[in-house]
Design a protein with these regions (language model features):
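Aromatic- and Lys/Arg-enriched surface recognition patch
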Residues: 62-133
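Mixed-charge, low-complexity intrinsically disordered regions
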Residues: 1-9, 69-71, 116-117, 121-156
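Short, charged beta-turn/beta-strand-edge "cap" motif at the junction between a beta-strand
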Residues: 51-57
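Short acidic/glycine-rich loop or secondary-structure boundary segments that cap or lie
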Residues: 14-16, 57-60, 72-75
Length: 156
């Protein structure tokens, strides 16, 4: 099993949306490295830290899992769609997506600030300056630490 961090802006799709829908397709990824992670490495059952970016605060808001392995992002071939890519064809889709299934919403967001200061997360990709990739690998230890932080009762 592998572990991932997947970023999404909450105004586009949030952990609340995933909790309501129970599953969703993760379409619209238009970065080759992120696409390669989805296409070549993500497997059904892999665990995901669901990260709310451009939020107040930005951070991990819950857990998900890969519920369907990579398949062609059909929106890439739909003319006029916001994710259309004129180079993509049904024979060579270029872009792929996976499906995510909901696991858990945390009582409070584990903020980026908390991630940066938590022991054991010093090497976590998301904490590095300039780390903008929307899909990032995380280690099992990082996943477990963030999950523990997320399940902790919020301090008042």
């Amino acid at each position: 099993m592998k572990y991932w961090l997947m970023k999404c802006e909450p105004n586009a799709y949030s952990i609340d949306d995933l909790e309501r829908d129970r599953s969703t397709s993760w379409e619209g990824v238009r970065n080759y490295q992120a696409r390669n992670f989805m296409r070549d490495e993500m497997k059904k059952g892999d665990r995901v830290l669901f990260y709310a970016s451009n939020a107040d605060p930005s951070g991990v808001s819950g857990l998900a899992e890969i519920s369907r392995e990579a398949y062609a992002d059909q929106f890439a071939t739909k003319s006029g769609h916001k994710y259309h890519d004129p180079k993509a064809t049904k024979e060579d889709p270029i872009w792929y997506m996976v499906d995510l299934g909901f696991i858990e919403k945390f009582p409070a967001v584990v903020s980026l600030e908390t991630l940066k200061s938590a022991p054991g997360l010093e090497e976590m990709v998301v904490t590095r300056k300039g780390s903008r990739l929307s899909i990032q690998p995380v280690t099992r230890q990082e996943f477990e630490i963030v999950s523990r932080l997320g399940r902790a009762k919020p301090k008042r």
